[in-house]
Structures are given as structure tokens and as C-alpha cells.
Amino acid sequence: HFPSGYKQALITDIVKKPGLDATDAGSYRPISNLSVVSKLLERLIVRQLMDYLSDNDLLPPLQSGFRAGHSTETAVLRVLSDILQAVDRGDVAALVLLDLSAAFDTVDHDILLQRLKLSFGVQGAAHSWFKSYLTGRTQVVRRGVLRSSVCRLLCGVPQGSVLGPILFVLYTADILSLVEDGGLLPHMYADDTQVYGSCPPTAAKELSQKLSDCVNAVASWMTSNRLQLNANKTEVLWCATGRRQYQLPTDPLPVAGAPVLPVTSVCDLGICVDGDLVMRTHVQRTVSRCFAALRQLRQIRRCVTADTLRTLVVSLVLSRLDYGNSVLVGLPAYLTVRLQSVLNASARLICNLRRYDSVTDALAGLHWLRVRERVQYKIAVLTYKSLHGVAPHYLGPMLRVADQPGRQALRSSGTNRLVAPSVRLATVGSRTFAAAGPTVWNSLPEAVTSAGTLATFRRHLKTHLFAKSFPA
């Protein structure tokens, strides 16, 4: 059994963001604090559970949440690559982002335990342990010096726990197959669900109806499983090239009884996607947030050491600049210039240069790759991981090794050239991972691609790209 002393949570609150009404309860986010010892115990269980699920191929393949080697970026990369590939064929595509209300808090314990037993083979003592883990939990809310009475928790996976998110992933695994049965493509990251599909422009209304039927089926499944789809926050985005924008539907999509109007852009797991797939909104938001952080850092520049300032810039600015940049391959030059301006301003701040001073020597001294090479670096690393089986399973099949018999086909004992698929539009099809991965990989020398470990590959790759950016 799970020790009862580890089942009590202490709930505190923090303001969601500055400027919200402090008297409104909706302005606060509850934070669940659990025993540190209980989290250590949960880590051991998670390790055993994940090993069991992996060894028996039971993990949902298109669920990227809480899995090693998976991330929000790889999830969006897969979805956006599929959409770009469809648009490159001349089709139009639609992406629906589903939003759940308090998803982790409404999980039904009986349904979860039944699913663990029937769908994932968790039986006997292990099943009894999970039942003990989920039931008999309590929480106390603390606000300042005040404390509430003890409240029993009758549903939901434990917030703030290590095991809870994994259990939620297993609880919602059927959503993926439900979407696929509806003839559409799904992808999930925890409770963030993406449903998408494509069709010829003349069949857009049929695709819209298929999306509506599928999403309503998902909403019905959620209701029967004690989850609630938030139709007011569900978004629909139609994607096509600029010339086909006029062919996109403008009618609302009926979702759970509420009409959802198509939007011109959506924020998918922190990456903004526009209907024309040019990524203007994402670049604009990234540049705006990075410069806001730089303005704040400029105010404290004289109060910190150069090393501290560099650490802050890397943590608060470059992390934003690099997030999601695997989907920025093939950007129009003017958008790349805007992103590069952030990198240049960061280097000027650290090196105390004036606004119009040359930044080339500063970038070289900091050993920073330019934006274009940073994108190539990310693509190359994901390609290496895919070829060596440490990337998400849904990325590997997008790459194809050149079929050239004999040892002459090998660039080295472990590195083959990759085949880039033919594309119709260079500004669309060449931006998919299936095309960008081989293009970047085949441009690298054998000394880089033949690296035996990921760490060695990263080191050699950066050295190679740095030499290209700043030739001696």
C-alpha cells in the first residue's frame, strides 16, 4: 500500500500574472505541495512503470507528454511537418486545438484503475498499490496564517506528484485511437490535444464536417470519462498557401454545441502558427518578448558581473530565441533578420557595445552561432537522434536512408546519406522535417556525422557550424 502519511497535500496560491485583481479567486493558481519522501518513492514507481510500458510497447505513440526524448517542440514539429507536406501537395489543412477544463482534477479513480488493469495489464499487487495511491487522499488550503479544514479528494490524479501525469497520459490514451478512427490525425502533449487533417480545396466542407464529427465524438468520450472539453477555448485554424487563402472555409465549426469560428493564427504549445504557415506571428512575439527581457537586463547591467550577465541573457533571452526553432527552417530572409537582431542586441549588451557597433567579433568571442546556424544545429541534432533511435518514434519514419548497395554507399561505418523527398514549393515542402533533416545532414562532413555519441556529435557539429559562420 501507499503510506497514508504521504497522502495529504498542502495547497497554497500564487497570482497567475502581475496586474490581475487580487480580490478575484480566478486570479490565483493553486500550488499543491506534497511530501518530498513521497516524491522519491513515486520516482521509483515511475521508473518501473515506464520500463514495463516501454518493454511491452504500451505507451501511446503520439503522446509526447512526460516521456524521455519527447518535448513540446518535437510534437509541434511532427504536426507542422504533416501540415506543410499536405499544403505542398496543393491541399488545404485544418488544425483543431482542444482545451480541457481542470483535466487532471476530474479523473475518475474507478475508470482509471479499470483501464490500468484491462488496457495496460497492471494486475495483482501492483494494481492494489495504485488503488491505495489514488484513494484516501486529503488536502488543506493555506492562505497566510490561515488554514482550512481537511478536505477529502474523491477524484483526480494528485497535483504536484511525479506519478500523476503518467497516469493521466494512460487515462486519456483512447482519445488518440478515437481520432484516428474518425479518419483524422491526432497528437497529444499531456492534456493538450491536436486534431488535424487535409483535403483538396474542393473538399474543404467535407473535411470541416469530419472535424466536427470527430471533435464531438471526443467530447462525448470525455463526458463519459468525467472530463470536460472547454468549447470556448477550442480553436480552429485553416492552413493553405497565400494563393489559396480565399478557398478556406469561414463557417464556424460546431463543437459540443458551441460554434467555433476559424482564427488566423493559433498558439500551439508555445509556438504560434499562422494560416499561411509563414510564422510571422511567432517571430513577432519571440522578438517582442526577447527585447522586453533585454530592456530589463540593461537596467541591472552595472550591478552584476559580466559572467552573471551572460548567464542571465542565455537563460532569459536565448532560451526564448531558440525555443521551437526547428520549425523555423526556411523562413523568409526578413524574418530571420528580425531574429538575428535579438542575438546581436544580446551580444552588444554583454560586450558593452553601442547600438551601431559591429557585432561580428562579439558573436565570435561569445562563441554564439548565428540564427540560421542555430536552426541548422537543432535540425541536425534531431536527425542524429532519429537515426540512432533516441528521438520520438514519430520522427524516425520521416527520414529515409539512401538505398545504395555496397560499401561505397557508406560515408562511414555508421552514417548513410539521407534521401530528401521531392517538393513542389520550396517555401513550403522544404520546411518539413522529412526534407530539412536530409538537407542539413547531407551538408555535414563525415567527421561530424560519424560521431559515436550524441555529446561528441554536438561538439563537432557546433565547431563545424561556427567555422562556417566565422571563417578565420
Q: Which functions belong to the PLM regions below?
A:
Residues 1-4:
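Short, low-complexity, charged/polar segments at coil/turn and helix-coil boundaries
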Residues 7-12, 17-472:
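Hydrophobic/basic alpha-helical segments
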